[in-house]
């Protein structure tokens, strides 16, 4: 039995919780199956997810992803327990390592041993959700004596991953794997590492859901859309996590130039390292048919759930056009 293909709106919709509530209402009325949060700052994703309990009647709510360094496993397990009760059968806990900018800069927390930390967090949270009393001494975490009431149907735990070691661990330990900001040429290699991790755990890779946050802009002006993507995401690729991933994905020269430009505080050099071809490999830009075709191609490549994340920041008309292109009456994943 093949895994269901799903289409999601991205959340939060704005700095105001009420806008996320309205986006979910719109998504349900327009054939979307899911709504997935990013979890970086305000409004808090997990709190807002709880606010959707009285609103979301059918869509699945996910978080892609909560950084494992900002909450202890016991806090994550307690939060997931509550959200699973509020959204029974329709909540996915997404965990990941985040980036140096967010952890070191925003939170003052060292991003150390990310593969091990994500793995140990996932294992601990899963055991806590099952009601097991904690007795864990790991390389990055320890917990003793914590126990919470078990759920009959605990929420699945999905793990964010970019490069081989993290992808393999995520497929081995997680119930699903979350991708982000990858060039399309890298997808076959990424899927090979999903298969390796699944085999290590004795699982079929076909049973592991692959979620992707797709940066999309339905537009008649590709040049403008490319420049928006460069302005928004060149700084991402300057961080060590994404810079190393970009080099691994086949853009080592661009990665080197981006890092150098960022170190020199030269935003023009940083953004200019991203060629049109490279931007088109990562972002999904163009008219409705072009954007739909790329999502369908990604589905054929192994992506099950596509989070539509419009690039049209601050422009409600462009955002609405992008979301409308994937509404149920106009788009079908098959």
State where each predicted segment sits.
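Active-site-adjacent structural elements that line small-molecule/cofactor binding pockets in enzymes
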Residues: 1-334
């Amino acid at each position: 039995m093949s895994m269901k293909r799903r289409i999601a709106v991205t959340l939060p919709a704005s700095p105001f919780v009420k806008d996320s509530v309205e986006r979910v209402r719109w998504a349900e009325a327009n054939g979307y199956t899911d709504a997935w949060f990013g979890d970086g700052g305000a409004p808090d994703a997990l709190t807002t997810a709880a606010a959707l309990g009285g609103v979301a009647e059918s869509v699945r709510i996910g978080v892609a992803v909560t950084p494992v360094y900002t909450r202890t496993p016991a806090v994550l397990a307690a939060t997931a327990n509550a959200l699973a009760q509020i959204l029974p059968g329709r909540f996915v806990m997404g965990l990941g390592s985040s980036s140096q900018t967010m952890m070191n800069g925003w939170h003052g927390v060292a991003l150390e041993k990310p593969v091990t930390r994500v793995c140990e967090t996932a294992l601990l949270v899963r055991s806590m959700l099952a009601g097991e009393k904690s007795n864990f001494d790991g390389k990055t975490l320890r917990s003793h004596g914590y126990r919470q009431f078990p759920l009959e149907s605990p929420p699945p735990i999905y793990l964010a991953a970019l490069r081989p070691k993290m992808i393999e661990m995520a497929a081995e330990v997680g119930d699903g794997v979350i991708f982000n900001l990858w060039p399309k040429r890298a997808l076959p290699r990424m899927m090979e590492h999903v298969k390796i991790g699944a085999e290590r755990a004795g699982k079929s890779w076909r049973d592991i859901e692959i979620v992707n946050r797709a940066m999309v802009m339905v537009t008649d002006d590709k040049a403008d859309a490319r420049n928006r993507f460069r302005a928004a995401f060149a700084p991402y690729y300057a961080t060590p996590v994404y810079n190393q991933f970009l080099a691994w994905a086949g853009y080592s020269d661009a990665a080197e130039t981006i890092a150098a430009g960022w170190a020199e505080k030269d935003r023009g050099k940083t953004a200019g390292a991203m060629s049109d071809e490279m931007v088109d490999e990562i972002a999904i830009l163009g008219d409705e048919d072009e954007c739909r075709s790329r999502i369908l191609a990604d589905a054929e490549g192994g992506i099950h759930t596509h989070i539509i994340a419009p690039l049209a920041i601050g422009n409600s008309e462009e955002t609405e056009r992008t979301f409308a292109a994937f509404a149920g009456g106009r788009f079908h994943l098959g």
